[in-house]
Regions:
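N-terminal helix-turn-helix DNA-binding module of bacterial transcription factors
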Residues: 1-30
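Alpha-helical recognition/docking segments in bacterial nutrient-uptake
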Residues: 24, 28-146, 206-211, 215
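Short, solvent-exposed amphipathic alpha-helices that sit
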Residues: 43-58, 140-143, 165-185, 226, ...
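Short beta-strand elements in bilobed, periplasmic/extracellular small-molecule ligand-binding domains
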Residues: 56-68, 156-158, 175-200
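An alpha-beta-alpha
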Residues: 142-182, 285-293
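Flexible loop/turn connectors
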Residues: 186, 203-293
Length: 293
């Protein structure tokens, strides 16, 4: 107790009624926590932001949201700006995480300024000392594919982003489940697109898979919804099961309906909780949130 009292007098920690002591650091960045996200408008983000802000605000922290648009150049500009006035902590959704990132040095500079960095959903494996809260995408790929196999599907295709680690992991999980049954798909049934130019790749994938598969695994609900619409617009729509991840309102929007996995826990709330532990000086480790049917 005496040691905590000394640290509080020196401004290195602060006590908050009902929630313990928090590290302030020499440059507190006031009580601001910055969020670096790829978007704030796609279907996932309103609830994600709500959960993060609600959890942090309950402990007296404000949030500033920066949007990278999933581009390295915008991420670079924003990190340079953040470095000039570091926040208490930084919560980041990584950019094109399956590619080499040119901005890793800026994250390391932030860490040297005693700014904790936590990754959410998409992380950079090179930053081994930065914990992350991600979905168990490998396990999700297995779960979804095993469900499709159990319902009698043998020709299963997929549409994934080639530049996002979550897309690669979902694909790996799918292939793992198929391999266990000896039902590996033809290479042409696994289709890829790039996240900053999705329309071209996704449209080509749809045209190919609709005529070749009985079930199609989509990276997210946006693609799944577009696929369902494309199938229903055909003169003679084939019977295709569409499966996805996220379980958003798009699963039951209008006359469209498809299967989509649900996070077992709200990612935003979990990430904000982990970040608060970091600010309290508690050692945290990376964690994966499972998917459920």
């Amino acid at each position: 107790r005496q040691a905590l009292s000394v640290l509080e007098q020196e401004g290195l920690i602060e006590k908050r009624q009902g929630s313990g002591s928090y590290i302030t650091g020499r440059s507190r960045g006031e009580d601001r926590i910055d969020l670096l996200l790829s978007s704030d408008s796609a279907y996932l983000y309103p609830m994600l932001l709500h959960d993060i802000k609600k959890t942090l605000a309950a402990q007296g922290f404000s949030t500033t949201v920066h949007i990278t648009e999933n581009t390295f150049s915008t991420e670079h500009t924003l990190l340079q700006k953040i470095l000039h006035q570091p926040p208490r902590a930084l919560l980041v959704e990584g950019v094109k995480t399956a590619r080499t990132n040119p901005n890793l040095d800026l994250y390391r500079k932030l860490q040297k300024k005693k700014c904790p960095v936590l990754f959410l959903q998409e992380s950079y494996p090179e930053l081994t000392n930065c914990p992350c809260v991600t979905m168990d995408d490998f396990g999700g790929g297995i779960l979804l594919t095993r469900h499709l196999l159990a319902t009698g599907h043998t020709r299963i295709g997929a549409i994934f982003p080639a530049d996002m680690r979550s897309g690669l992991l979902r694909c790996q999980g799918m292939l793992h489940a198929l391999r266990d049954t000896g039902a590996l798909p033809e290479d042409s049934l696994i289709c890829w697109y790039f996240s900053n130019d999705p329309d071209y790749g996704i449209q080509k994938a749809m045209q190919k898979l609709i005529s070749s598969c009985t079930a199609i695994v989509c990276y997210n609900d946006t693609i799944a919804y577009a696929l369902c619409r494309a199938v229903s617009d055909l003169p003679q729509p084939p019977e295709i099961t569409v499966a996805s991840f996220d379980h958003s309102y798009l699963c039951h929007f209008g006359h469209t309906e498809f299967l989509s996995l649900t996070p077992a826990e709200a990612p935003g709330s979990r990430a904000a909780g982990v970040l608060l532990h970091q600010l309290q000086g508690i050692l945290v480790s990376s964690t994966e949130i499972p998917w459920k049917l």
